[in-house]
Regions:
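Short acidic amphipathic segments
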Residues: 148-150
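A mobile, often basic/glycine-rich helix-loop segment
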Residues: 153
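Portal/gating segments that form or line small-molecule/metal binding sites
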Residues: 2-146, 158-198
Length: 198
């Protein structure tokens, strides 16, 4: 069965973007190394992403394991759904109370569903034995509250935003995590991975 991993790059104070949806220096580490994340046709879509050797040893296997991504409508709108070619995987599920945009890549088999549990179920089916990568934010916070998240993964960048879009969204209640099973210092990024305590 697939593993659901809540993931994003995050500031030290827990934000995945500022109040205006700008990421500032959060993604700088994706471009400060010598190891390209993508090769072949993927490199044509994401040509300049090269990370440090240390980060590559963690990020590349993780990205290669992703079978399906789940995003909220806000991220979908910001990225235009990556033009139906999400980074690191073939499948995408969008959680939204609004329908698929008219004319948006009619050839793409991208489900739009308004229920988080249903979205995770569809994503698990599409991912097979692969990872379901759940983008951090409000939808992921709901999934964590519903007990649908197996792992919380953060790429922490040394910047303080002060305010913005929260990694866990508007999360209710306390959720215990296990001790991290990954703590890896990259170049201007700290990779952390916490299994969710059951």
């Amino acid at each position: 069965m697939s593993t659901v991993v809540m993931h994003a790059v995050v500031s030290v104070d827990g934000f995945i973007a500022d109040d205006d949806d700008q990421v500032g220096p959060l993604f700088d580490w994706y471009f400060n190394g010598d190891r390209p994340l993508f090769a072949g046709s993927e490199a044509d879509v994401h040509p300049s992403m090269s990370i440090s050797e240390r980060s590559y040893g963690y990020v590349k296997p993780f990205w290669d394991s992703i079978g399906c991504a789940v995003v909220g409508r806000h991220l979908f709108d910001l990225t235009n759904g990556w033009e139906a070619k999400p980074p690191a995987c073939e499948h995408l599920v969008v959680v939204s109370h609004r329908p698929r945009p008219d004319g948006w890549h009619p050839e793409a088999d991208v489900p739009f569903v308004d229920d988080v549990t249903e979205a995770i179920g569809i994503a698990r089916s599409l991912a097979g034995d692969g990872v379901v990568a759940l983008s951090a934010g409000n939808v992921a916070g709901q999934a964590l509250s519903l007990g649908l998240v197996d792992v919380v993964a953060m790429d922490v960048v040394p910047v303080v935003f002060g305010s913005g879009k929260r990694y866990f969204g508007h999360l209710d209640g306390q959720h215990l995590l296990e001790d991290p099973d990954v703590v890896l210092q990259g170049d201007r990024v700290l990779h952390l991975r916490y299994p969710v305590r059951r």
